[in-house]
């Protein structure tokens, strides 16, 4: 029976011990989190005026890499946006950037203004370009829902896991030898499998390192587009839909042979 124990949780980070699931399933979840989660990112830019020293192309590139808050519950499912089931405007948000320098000034991500109040740069202090007196930047940008499998600017989070290690200390002097690498050898959350293996190599046969089958330490960290819990829920939704689509395709194939 699958079991999950939360070890650490904050707005943008979560760590848990997961038991009773095969590695293929937990790895599928990891891959969905890394490459399939939808987020808003600037995808097209209209440069109205740019008298800064930065080329228009470089300016557009920088704007595209600024993470934006993404209110998933108020946006269509990414599948509907990709398939054209909804109007493209429902999957797009317009942003403007207008800065006229009256002295030396730095243009920041926080100067971007979206048409929607629930969409804004996650980190407002990201510098975009420097201006001197008399220079200006006026830009109209369009952010759309996308996935990291198409471009890294649409990546919402990182996720990883490692097997739950089981460490047996046969010689007490090994604890002192491994103190700098791992202070508590028997604590799998503090002493990861890699750290335990390093200690094993340092101490020879004084430490035995194994792992528990179908038990892992899993963590996820959001880039701030939405919180870690939302990222996990969306990842499970996408993974479930993939299974459903696979079963539907399999059923149609079987029916066609009858």
Curated annotation (Swiss-Prot):
Record's keyword terms, sorted: Cytoplasm, DNA-directed RNA polymerase, Nucleotidyltransferase, Transcription, Transferase
Pfam families: RNA_pol_A_bac, RNA_pol_L
EC numbers, comma separated: 2.7.7.6
One of the GO BP terms on file: DNA-templated transcription
Residues spanning the membrane: none
Catalytic activity reported: RNA(n) + a ribonucleoside 5'-triphosphate = RNA(n+1) + diphosphate
Enzyme class: transferase
Annotated compartments: Cytoplasm
GO MF annotations, alphabetized: DNA binding; DNA-directed RNA polymerase activity; protein dimerization activity
Record carries keyword Transport: no
Gene Ontology CC entries for this record: cytoplasm; DNA-directed RNA polymerase complex
Subunit description: Part of the RNA polymerase complex.
NCBIfam families: PRK00783.1
Entry's family note: Belongs to the archaeal Rpo3/eukaryotic RPB3 RNA polymerase subunit family.
HAMAP family: RNApol_arch_Rpo3
Function: DNA-dependent RNA polymerase (RNAP) catalyzes the transcription of DNA into RNA using the four ribonucleoside triphosphates as substrates.
Protein name: DNA-directed RNA polymerase subunit Rpo3
Organism: Pyrobaculum calidifontis (strain DSM 21063 / JCM 11548 / VA1)
Gene name of the record: rpo3
């Amino acid at each position: 029976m699958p079991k999950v124990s939360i070890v650490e949780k904050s707005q943008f980070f979560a760590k848990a011990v997961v038991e009773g699931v095969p590695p293929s399933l937990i790895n599928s979840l990891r891959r969905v989190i890394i490459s399939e989660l939808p987020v808003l990112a600037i995808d097209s830019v209209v440069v109205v005026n740019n008298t800064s020293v930065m080329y228009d192309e470089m300016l557009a590139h920088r704007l595209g890499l600024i993470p934006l808050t993404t209110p998933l519950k108020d946006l269509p499912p990414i599948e509907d946006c990709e398939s054209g089931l909804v109007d493209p405007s429902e999957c797009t948000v317009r942003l403007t950037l207008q800065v006229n320098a009256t002295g030396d000034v730095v243009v920041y991500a926080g100067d971007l203004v979206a048409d929607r109040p629930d969409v804004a740069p996650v980190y407002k202090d990201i510098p975009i370009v420097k201006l001197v007196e008399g220079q200006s930047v006026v830009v109209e940008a369009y952010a759309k829902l996308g996935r990291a499998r198409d471009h890294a600017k649409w990546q919402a989070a990182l996720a990883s896991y490692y097997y739950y290690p089981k460490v047996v200390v046969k010689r007490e002097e090994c604890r002192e030898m491994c103190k700098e690498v791992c202070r508590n050898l028997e604590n799998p959350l503090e002493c990861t499998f890699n750290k335990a293996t390093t200690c094993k190599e340092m101490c020879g046969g004084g430490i035995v390192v194994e792992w528990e089958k179908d038990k892992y330490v899993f963590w996820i960290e959001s880039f701030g587009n939405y919180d870690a819990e939302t990222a996990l829920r969306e990842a499970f939704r996408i993974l479930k839909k993939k299974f459903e689509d696979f079963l539907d395709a399999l059923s149609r194939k079987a029916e066609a042979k009858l």
